[in-house]
């Protein structure tokens, strides 16, 4: 038997119920594509600066009540090197959609999908450390229509070892 757990990426949360469910599964697929590449000073090297698009799709059946979002889709744009002299920084904007599991919370009947609009900028402080201030606007947090929309300001950081 496999432990029932859920996880979201990009600084999201992870939960663990301690329950098991026979035969559960899920999958995700992500696609990234550069749309525009800034010209390189050195013709023999391709510039890493430019605009890219990404798409993420995940699915896990809603046959258990712990899986609150059986379907999730996110799309966005990332520009690397948008600011002059900051060629390793990235500027991001993304839109996410999570479809609420109708069986997830029987006490709350007024639920719907959750939508997230996010924007941020990652500052590459040095070769191994970045800081990323961001803002998110969330419509129907937790898929609950009775909860007011939320705007969240945050700061994430990362290290490469």
Question: What feature does the model see in each segment?
Answer:
Residues 36-51, 81-90, 125-128:
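Short loop/turn motifs that connect adjacent beta-strands in outer-membrane beta-barrel proteins
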Residues 1, 51-59, 73-75, 91-99, ...:
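Transmembrane beta-barrel strands of outer-membrane/channel proteins
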Residues 29, 75-77, 93, 117-119, ...:
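Membrane-embedded beta-strands of outer-membrane beta-barrel proteins
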Residues 1-4, 36-40, 58-64, 98-105, ...:
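Sequence/structural signature of outer-membrane beta-barrel proteins
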Residues 1-30:
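Surface-exposed beta-loop-beta
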Residues 149-161:
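Outer-membrane beta-barrel "beta-signal"
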Residues 32-36, 78-82, 120-122, 158-160:
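Transmembrane beta-barrel domains of outer membrane proteins
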């Amino acid at each position: 038997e496999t432990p029932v757990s859920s996880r979201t990426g990009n600084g999201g949360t992870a939960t663990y119920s301690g329950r098991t469910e026979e035969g559960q599964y899920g999958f995700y697929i992500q696609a990234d594509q550069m749309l525009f590449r800034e010209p390189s000073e050195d013709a023999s090297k391709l510039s890493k600066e430019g605009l890219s698009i990404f798409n993420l799709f995940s699915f896990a059946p809603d046959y258990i009540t712990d899986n609150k979002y059986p379907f999730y889709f996110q799309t966005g744009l990332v520009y690397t090197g948008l600011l002059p002299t900051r060629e390793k920084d990235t500027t991001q904007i993304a839109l996410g959609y999570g479809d609420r599991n109708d069986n997830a919370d029987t006490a709350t009947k007024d639920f719907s999908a959750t939508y997230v609009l996010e924007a941020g900028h990652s500052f590459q402080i040095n070769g191994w450390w970045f800081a990323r201030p961001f803002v998110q606007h969330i419509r129907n947090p937790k898929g609950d229509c009775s909860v007011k929309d939320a705007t969240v300001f945050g700061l994430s950081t990362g290290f490469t070892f």
